[in-house]
C-alpha cells in the first residue's frame, strides 16, 4: 500500500531543507530554494481524491549535477547535505553516520515529534484522570496534535507565487503544511490548545461550553 492510498494514516511529504550549509558551485546546484517542497515528494490528490501528503517536514537536500551534455542527475552521495542518520560503518568511517534525503527521512523526524506530543498528552491524562492515554485513542490524538499546529505560513506567499495560486489554495494540493509542535504543546496568555476525546454515533454530537479567557475577549485575533 503506497502512502497516496492511505485513508487513516498520516502521510508525510519532504521539505527541501536540512541543517547543513554547503555552497553551490558551477556544476552542483540546488534543485529548489531551501524550505520549499522537495522534488522528491509527490503532491496532489491521493486515493478517492484525499489530500496526500497530509504534512511536510524536513526531508534533507541533495545537489543536482549539471552534466556536460546538458542533462542533470541527482547526486546520491552520503556526505553533506542531507539529514544526518545512523548508518552502517564503512571503510574509513568512525562515526557510523551518513546524510540522506527523502520522504522517509521526513517521516522519521515526524515520528520523533509525535513522541514529544505523546509525552505531553500522557502527562496531562495522568494528572486529570489518574491513568495514561488509552491505547485505542493514542493514534488519533497524536494525528490531531501534529495536524493542528501545521500551516504553510513561513513560505505561503513564495509557494503560492511558484504554483500560480492563492495561499488559501495551497492545502488543496499540499495538505496542511509544516507542523509547529511548540505551538501545540505550549499555551500562552493569548493561545490555548483544547483536547476533546470521545465517541459519537450517526446524527449525534457533543456540545462543549468553555469560559473565554479575558485576553481573548478583549481583542480581535485569528482562531484555528
Residue spans for each PLM region:
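Short alpha-helical segments and helix-capping/turn motifs at coil-helix boundaries
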Residues: 1, 35-42, 215, 219
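Loop/turn elements at helix/coil->beta-strand transitions in domains of secreted/extracellular proteins
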Residues: 7-10
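Secreted peptidase-domain scaffold signal
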Residues: 162-224
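An often Trp-containing, charged/polar helix-loop segment at the C-terminal end
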Residues: 119-158
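Catalytic-core environment of secreted peptidases
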Residues: 15-28, 36-37, 41-107, 124
Amino acid at each position: 500500500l503506497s502512502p497516496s492510498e492511505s485513508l487513516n494514516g498520516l502521510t508525510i511529504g519532504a521539505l527541501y531543507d536540512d541543517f547543513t550549509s554547503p555552497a553551490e558551485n558551477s556544476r552542483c546546484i540546488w534543485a529548489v530554494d531551501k524550505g520549499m517542497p522537495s522534488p522528491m515528494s509527490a503532491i496532489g490528490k491521493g486515493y478517492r481524491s484525499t489530500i496526500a501528503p497530509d504534512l511536510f517536514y524536513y526531508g534533507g537536500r541533495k545537489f543536482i549535477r549539471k552534466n556536460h551534455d546538458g542533462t542533470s542527475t541527482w547526486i546520491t552521495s552520503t556526505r553533506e547535505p542531507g539529514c544526518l542518520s545512523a548508518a552502517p560503518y564503512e571503510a574509513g568511517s568512525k562515526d557510523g553516520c551518513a546524510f540522506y534525503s527523502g520522504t522517509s527521512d521526513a517521516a522519521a523526524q515526524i515520528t520523533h515529534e509525535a513522541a514529544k506530543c505523546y509525552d505531553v498528552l500522557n502527562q496531562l491524562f495522568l494528572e486529570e484522570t489518574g491513568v495514561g492515554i488509552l491505547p485505542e485513542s493514542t493514534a488519533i490524538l497524536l494525528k490531531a496534535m501534529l495536524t493542528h499546529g501545521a500551516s504553510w505560513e513561513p513560505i505561503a506567499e513564495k509557494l503560492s507565487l511558484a504554483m500560480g495560486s492563492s495561499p488559501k489554495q495551497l492545502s488543496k494540493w499540499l495538505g496542511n503544511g509544516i507542523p509547529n509542535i511548540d505551538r501545540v504543546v505550549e499555551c500562552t496568555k493569548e493561545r490555548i490548545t483544547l483536547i476533546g476525546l470521545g465517541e459519537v454515533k450517526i446524527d449525534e454530537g457533543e456540545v462543549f461550553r468553555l469560559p473565554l479567557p479575558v485576553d481573548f475577549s478583549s481583542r480581535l485575533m485569528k482562531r484555528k
